[in-house]
Amino acid sequence: MTELISIKDSSKHVDQEVKMHVWLTDKRSSGKIIFLQLRDGTAFFQGVVRKNDVTDEVFEVAKSLRQESSFYITGTVHEDARSHFGYEIQITDLKVVSNNEGYPIGNKEHGIDFLLDHRHLWLRSKKPFAIMQIRNTMFKATVDFFEKEDFIKFDAPIFMHSAPEGTTQLFHVDYFDHDAYLSQSGQLYGEAGAMAFGKIFTFGPTFRAEESKGRRHMTEFWMMEPEMAWMHQDESLDLQERYLAYMVKQVLDKNEYELKILGRDPEKLRPTTEGNFVRLPYDDAVKMLQDAGRDFKWGDDFGAPDEGYISEQYDRPVFIVNYPTSIKPFYMKKNPDNPKEYLCADVIAPEGYGEIFGGSEREGNYEVLEQQIIDAGLNLEDYQWYLDLRKFGGVPHSGFGMGFERTIAWVCHLDHIREAIPFPRLINRMQP
């Protein structure tokens, strides 16, 4: 019996007759030969229909196929050194499932607004396909890494009574007779999980009502947020470095084909897999910018151009450590050697991509945290449960958050974060 296979498994079936179910992405003909560009969700490759190898009926059906028609094929797999994929199939039989005309995304240049309007169909094209395959590898690498490190997956709520970083940039929701907000972060609940299970990570959607059209901002995006009991900041930085190195190595090992589709040079990513990330104090980063003639003073937060400049000085991610307390959230622990600083760090991706991780050692002292909540102008009652984590068995603990789409954008070398998620939600876009 002829085996049904996927395109990605073609290398295991060279010179064998196989069956596949596929979609047509493009077609061209040279008289007695029809070249079909095919996809099946696992890869893209070429099918060849020769008039002398098929019945007249099959050849006429092949001639009639339109873009994104779907059909079953039978044929023999051969090597094809000319293609990115390396294989093609000589088709001997073909049965159509659907063959409608008018597919809106033709094989020509389209503007980004048109493509986003048709995102439900654009996902079928090569570039989105490659990005989503890499996204999937990075997701699986994340779960694999943290399982090996004895973390458990911990789910935080989406509806929040209060926000971990104040009440700005929040989506308000009418929650029966109460006010609620869409989550900006699962961190505070993750800390509760860490006190119960030791090491946890949350992974889910977060929401920020940022009125920004910048290339690094969306209103809905995914965050991966580990929290670790009994862990200090330096240990957390070591963990972050191992994790990022592991995740990028998985992409290099498993997504060579997709990186080729994107034109992404894998050698630009390889230094990250070696670790040894520089730990650059905030003070030194300020001096770096000032020495470069930039208008930046101590106490300012880094903007995207500042982070971009810093990242371009390194061939791998860099930690910027110990920011001023005035520009970071209330839950961080102050540096005992300099109370004007928090024990915190942001990971800045190379090649101008800027911040992708942010983390800190968390303040573990009840009285100190209580005062920091008050100083931040927050309602103490909203955070009483959070203070209980310190009151009852509080321990030193640390955590960080990774912006998943920002990290994907860097790995894939994308111009805009909107391409790193299947259906982007932007200030001016909620459909499809």
Swiss-Prot record:
Gene3D superfamilies recorded: Bira Bifunctional Protein, Domain 2, Nucleic acid-binding proteins
Protein's GO biological process: asparaginyl-tRNA aminoacylation
Pfam families, per the entry: tRNA-synt_2 (PF00152), tRNA_anti-codon (PF01336)
Primary location recorded for the protein, binned into one broad class: cytoplasm
Catalyzed reaction equations: tRNA(Asn) + L-asparagine + ATP = L-asparaginyl-tRNA(Asn) + AMP + diphosphate + H(+)
Subcellular localization: Cytoplasm
PROSITE patterns noted in UniProt: AA_TRNA_LIGASE_II
One GO MF term: transferase activity
Entry's EC annotation: 6.1.1.22
Key word Ligase present: yes
Cited HAMAP family: Asn_tRNA_synth
Descriptive protein name: Asparagine--tRNA ligase
Species of origin: Lactobacillus helveticus (strain DPC 4571)
Gene designation per UniProt: asnS
